[in-house]
Amino acid sequence: MRVGCGYDSHRWAAKRKLILGGVEIPHEFGLTGHSDADALTHAICDALLGAISEGDIGFQFPDSDPAYSGISSLKLLSKILEMVDKKGFAIDYIDSTVIMERPKLMPYIPDMKSKIAGVLKMPSDRINIKAKTNEGMGFVGRQEGVAVFAVALVKENQD
């Protein structure tokens, strides 16, 4: 078994959609980014890439490449699943924490889990998403952006 850790953060931006875990969440702001700026999916991508020793999302899908401009992060996650499979691993479990002051995410978490599970071809009960605030501290507390941590556990395929 291997473990990978992922982290991502994005600034708030006007005139952008807020997408987390592939789910569009109604909010007055979205997140800045070259892709759809889905910080949750990006952190999960980084955790999976770390677990299979393949760098990070910026290395695999550089923001200097116009092919990734505005791309759905779920498409990137799908490509990473192919890499996991090719390296001889299977995803066992994902745990993540989204840190933002608002909006409240609890109503959207089941849909996020379902979308991520669908892309990763795994049961949604093997994906955990927690939502926390930063109690008014730091850049998250000042509502300048969001931060996400993720951990992925992968195991070698037993062929």
Curated annotation (Swiss-Prot):
Residue positions binding a divalent metal cation: 8, 10, 42
Cofactor names: a divalent metal cation
CC cofactor note: Binds 1 divalent metal cation per subunit.
Catalysed transformations (reactions): 4-CDP-2-C-methyl-D-erythritol 2-phosphate = 2-C-methyl-D-erythritol 2,4-cyclic diphosphate + CMP
Taxonomy, superkingdom: Bacteria
Residues that bind 4-CDP-2-C-methyl-D-erythritol 2-phosphate: 8-10, 34-35, 56-58, 61-65, 139, 142
InterPro entries assigned: MECDP_synthase, MECDP_synthase_CS, MECDP_synthase_sf
Site (described: Transition state stabilizer): 34, 133
Keywords from the named record: Isoprene biosynthesis, Lyase, Metal-binding
Family the entry assigns: Belongs to the IspF family.
HAMAP family (UniProt xref): IspF (MF_00107)
Protein name per Swiss-Prot or TrEMBL: 2-C-methyl-D-erythritol 2,4-cyclodiphosphate synthase
Source organism of the structure: Syntrophus aciditrophicus (strain SB)
